[in-house]
Design a protein with these regions (language model features):
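Non-catalytic substrate-recognition/targeting regions of SAM-dependent transferases
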Residues: 8-22, 29-96, 103
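Conserved alpha-helix/loop element of class I SAM-dependent methyltransferases that forms part
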Residues: 97-112
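Conserved class I S-adenosyl-L-methionine
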Residues: 116-122
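Conserved SAM-binding loop of SAM-dependent methyltransferases across substrates and taxa
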Residues: 126-137
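Conserved SAM-binding motif I beta-strand of class I
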Residues: 139-144
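S-adenosyl-L-methionine
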Residues: 152-187
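Single conserved hydrophobic/aromatic residue that forms the stacking wall/gate
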Residues: 203-210
């Protein structure tokens, strides 16, 4: 198991009763987490000093309740800076556990004997992996179907000092983009792929190419 233990601006403070108490820089958020199956005493004072609480609805979805929380703020991981904006389905725009993967492939890129590493990041969301790969020296193609997410990823790149980095921003269906890249004969040294749960395994397998 890899542990994302390089964070200074993020930590899981506590968890109980299906919820996770987190610190995102100087702000404390409480969000639902289905993996928190236990009920333990909530002794940490941070439980009573929330800046944001996402309430899950019995009908699905839910809504945020804010307490002195800005609409947007930044969080740092090593030499990367990300813009956070709480939005639907309890999200903040970043999955901090992915930092373990960022560290892993960043070292591979830096230590590669090949100078120009080309990375394809599919379902790339707000660009955490894109920024990490670009900061390590790779040329990155960032693909996501959401224009809003690609715009957000560009903001993260700019905040991380990567506004002029060799990143190609693509708003497109990832599977269709890959099909076109195969027909074009374009190749990459590495592919990063973290599809949302709404993309079925069968759908992805149907588009596999050796």
């Amino acid at each position: 198991m890899w542990i994302a233990d390089g964070w200074k601006d993020y930590e899981v403070i506590d968890c109980s009763d299906g919820e996770k108490l987190e610190r995102w820089d100087k702000y404390t958020l409480l969000r639902p987490d289905p993996q928190v199956l236990w009920s333990t005493p909530k002794k940490n004072p941070a439980w009573n000093k929330l800046n944001g609480h996402y309430h899950r609805s019995n009908k699905g979805g839910g809504e945020w309740e804010f307490f002195s929380l800005p609409k947007q703020w930044t969080i740092n991981y090593r030499d990367l800076t990300f813009n956070l904006k709480p939005f639907s389905f309890k999200h903040t725009g970043l999955f901090p556990e992915q930092a373990a993967n960022w560290d892993w492939f960043s070292e591979l890129i830096k230590n590669s004997p090949k100078k120009d590493i080309k990375v394809l990041n599919l379902f790339a969301y707000t660009g955490g992996a894109t920024c990490a790969a670009a900061k390590a020296g790779a040329t990155v193609t960032h693909v996501d179907a959401s224009k809003g997410m690609v715009t957000w990823a560009k903001e993260n790149a700019a905040s991380s000092g990567l506004a002029d980095a060799p990143i190609r921003w693509i708003v497109d269906d990832c599977v269709k983009f890959v099909e076109r890249e195969i027909r074009r004969g374009n190749k990459y040294d590495a592919i990063i792929m973290d599809p949302p749960s709404s993309v079925s395994y069968t759908h992805l397998r149907a588009h596999e190419t050796a």
